[in-house]
């Protein structure tokens, strides 16, 4: 089980909406529809808006820069239109000179709503996105820790099985040492299998060298007991081979190969 498997991370990259006047024009249309349906515009959710447009994937500096650029662009566009159509602009402006003008009242309300939106956006940029980044970081650290814990548990399980099987094989080998005539082929097979189990157990214990848990300490003691019993059996068999080398050639070769690789 690997929570950070590369195959699971092979996802399509999200595409953020382009920050443009058309994007905000669409939101304005939604405001109009909301007012028509009797929905309070104050309930506008800035977080949902930014997430729907995938803006939370943008760096904060880029988001602020793009919004500032759009604001400057709109001001410049308005100035250019005023210069090119000054007379029309004067006529347009006269419609807002009356303090009781309904259009002016709606414009002021829109300005107030826009200010609320910008305040919420500023709060999101300064606080919420920063908090989200911290949460993501914590989650990744948590998943990494779970991987480490799972790997440790898997090693513990493998070590327990190896030591348990090793104890049974070591007991059988020790009993075989007292049988006459000596079953050379069986003893050689037991020695080879025991050596593999002891080597694997030692490697797992080395990977847990930094652990001081009581359970690991117990497994280390079991490993030492198994190793000592194995060494006693090897000593007995070595003495038998030295006493009668001609009749125990295969067993002698097995013992020599173990000594060379140890």
From Swiss-Prot:
InterPro entries: COG2_C (IPR054494), COG_su2_N (IPR024602). GO terms for biological process: cytoplasm to vacuole targeting by the Cvt pathway; endoplasmic reticulum to Golgi vesicle-mediated transport; intra-Golgi vesicle-mediated transport; macroautophagy; pexophagy; retrograde transport, vesicle recycling within Golgi. It is a peripheral membrane protein. Its main location: Golgi. Keywords: Golgi apparatus, Membrane, Protein transport, Transport. GO terms for cellular component: cytosol; Golgi membrane; Golgi transport complex. It is found in: Golgi apparatus membrane. It comes from the Eukaryota. It holds the Pfam family COG2_N. Present with 3270 molecules/cell in log phase SD medium. Component of the conserved oligomeric Golgi (COG or Sec34/Sec35) complex which consists of eight different proteins COG1-COG8. The COG complex interacts with the Rab GTPase YPT1, the Glogi SNAREs GOS1, SEC22, SED5, VTI1 and YKT6 and the COPI coatomer subunit gamma SEC21. Acts as a component of the peripheral membrane COG complex that is involved in intra-Golgi protein trafficking. COG is located at the cis-Golgi, and regulates tethering of retrograde intra-Golgi vesicles and possibly a number of other membrane trafficking events. COG2 is required for ER to Golgi vesicle docking. Not essential for viability. This is Conserved oligomeric Golgi complex subunit 2. It comes from Saccharomyces cerevisiae (strain ATCC 204508 / S288c).
């Amino acid at each position: 089980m690997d929570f950070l498997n590369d195959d699971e991370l092979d996802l399509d990259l999200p595409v953020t909406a382009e920050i443009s006047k058309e994007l905000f024009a669409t939101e304005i249309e939604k405001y109009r529809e909301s007012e028509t349906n009797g929905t309070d515009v104050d309930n506008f959710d800035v977080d949902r808006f930014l997430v729907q447009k995938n803006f939370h994937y943008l760096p904060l500096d880029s988001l602020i820069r793009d919004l500032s650029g759009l604001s400057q662009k709109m001001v410049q566009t308005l100035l250019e239109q005023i210069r090119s159509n000054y007379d029309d602009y004067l006529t347009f402006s006269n419609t807002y000179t009356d303090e009781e003008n309904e259009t002016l009242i709606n414009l002021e309300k829109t300005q107030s709503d826009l200010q609320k939106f910008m305040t919420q956006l500023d709060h999101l940029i300064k606080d919420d996105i920063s908090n989200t980044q911290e949460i993501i970081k914590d989650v990744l650290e948590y998943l990494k820790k779970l991987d480490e814990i799972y790997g440790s548990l898997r090693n513990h399980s493998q070590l327990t099985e190896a030591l348990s099987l090793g104890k049974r094989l070591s007991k059988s080998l020790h009993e075989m040492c007292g049988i006459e005539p000596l079953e050379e082929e069986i003893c050689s097979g037991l020695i080879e299998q025991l050596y593999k189990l002891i080597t694997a157990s030692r490697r797992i214990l080395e990977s847990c060298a930094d652990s001081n848990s009581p359970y690991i300490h117990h497994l280390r003691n079991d490993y030492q007991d198994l190793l000592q019993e194995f060494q006693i059996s090897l000593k007995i068999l070595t003495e038998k081979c030295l006493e009668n080398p001609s009749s125990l050639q295969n067993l002698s070769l097995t013992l020599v190969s173990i000594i060379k690789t140890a």
